[in-house]
């Protein structure tokens, strides 16, 4: 009898329209960022070992540039780093308003391709070469160096990366 009564109550609650179920809109930004980090940390670590870019930097840039995977470029083009087409880009692209209207951004088959291309983008450009003289654990130097080399136009870019790295303990991936 108790089981039957419990079942009736459960059914009546589940049919109420006011009963909320977990959805993306109910997840806090902090939880979304943690989910993003959990999902992409393996790619960041793999690329760190191969290309020598601290995983903490890669993850912080991914979180910031992609809006933790929820930004337009991340959703429509799997572009998690805001990388523009630049001269010589022969891959797919998408048009998007950024610093200027209707700019060309790289488009990828999946986010992991974006993670790899981010590493290649930094390795292959002379303006970032000084970063590779820094120690892997010098995330502050990397953050400031990316800003100084012109990766982003936001004057607070380095501070935002540093804040994300410290708030979410991203240096744990730099080991």
Q: Could you describe each region identified by the protein language model?
A:
Residues 16-175:
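Catalytic cores of secreted/periplasmic lytic hydrolases that degrade extracellular macromolecules
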Residues 4-13:
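Sec-dependent N-terminal signal peptides
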